[in-house]
Amino acid sequence: MKFVAFERAKQGTGASRRLRITGRTPGIVYGGTAEPILIEIDHNALWHAIKKEAFHGSILEMELGGTEHKVLLRDLQMHPYKQQVQHIDFQRVEARTRMTVKVPVHFSGEEESPAVKTENCLVTHVLTEMTVSCFPADIPDFIAVDLGGLTKGKSLHVKDIVLPKRVKAAVKGQVNPVMVSVTPIVEEVVEVAPVVVDPKAAKGKAGAKPAAKPAAKK
């Protein structure tokens, strides 16, 4: 995925605010052996780009000053309530340097699993992306996970996922987060309290005389 960036000379809160007013988003490119570069990107183009899954987990081709740079999105700061990107960070990609990146997870087969089809269970996607470690050339666009074998009482953890070659899950020590949980659906039974009738009240109603009819007008 490609995008165009421009070098910017000024930095600081005031300069960034003025830049946003003109429809530009300030950013930075860092990493590798080169010095960090301050950049600016057209906000409209950036706003459309961030809506695409590939912009968040794939190697991006950034055109800067007529030169193409391979980068990864590292941070995205949004305005608290406006539809505005306040600042964006990219990291340079070096072919021989192993990287840690977040990759989206695509689930399938859930509706055909015994857990859903016959065991009346609720399947919850606890994590929808996975942090992996690999070389830039091996970064997958997404990780496919088949949930067709899920059964009642069985959860799927990060270390259960079969990853592509040369790609490893980036988890620390014995940590093994749950990716998918399976919970039995418990149907709540609402008990209706029986209506208690007072015998005396019922007898009184039965013996009550009907109301007298009004006299006819002459």
Curated annotation (Swiss-Prot):
Keyword match RNA-binding: yes
Domain of life, per lineage: Bacteria
Keyword Ribosomal protein: yes
Listed InterPro entries: Rbsml_bL25/Gln-tRNA_synth_N, Ribosomal_bL25/Gln-tRNA_synth, Ribosomal_bL25_b-dom, Ribosomal_bL25_C, Ribosomal_bL25_long, Ribosomal_bL25_short, Ribosomal_L25_dom, Ribosomal_uL5_bac-type
Keywords of the record: Ribonucleoprotein, Ribosomal protein, RNA-binding, rRNA-binding
Molecular function terms from GO: 5S rRNA binding; structural constituent of ribosome
GO BP, sorted A to Z: translation
GO CC field: cytosolic large ribosomal subunit
Any Pfam family matching the protein: Ribosomal_L25p
Family listed: Belongs to the bacterial ribosomal protein bL25 family. CTC subfamily.
Function: This is one of the proteins that binds to the 5S RNA in the ribosome where it forms part of the central protuberance.
PANTHER family: RIBOSOMAL PROTEIN L25/GLN-TRNA SYNTHETASE, ANTI-CODON-BINDING DOMAIN-CONTAINING PROTEIN, RIBOSOMAL PROTEIN L25_GLN-TRNA SYNTHETASE, ANTI-CODON-BINDING DOMAIN-CONTAINING PROTEIN
HAMAP family: Ribosomal_bL25, Ribosomal_bL25_CTC
Quaternary assembly: Part of the 50S ribosomal subunit; part of the 5S rRNA/L5/L18/L25 subcomplex. Contacts the 5S rRNA. Binds to the 5S rRNA independently of L5 and L18.
Name by which UniProt lists this protein: Large ribosomal subunit protein bL25
Species name: Polaromonas naphthalenivorans (strain CJ2)
Higher taxonomy: Bacteria, Pseudomonadati, Pseudomonadota, Betaproteobacteria, Burkholderiales
Name of the encoding gene: rplY
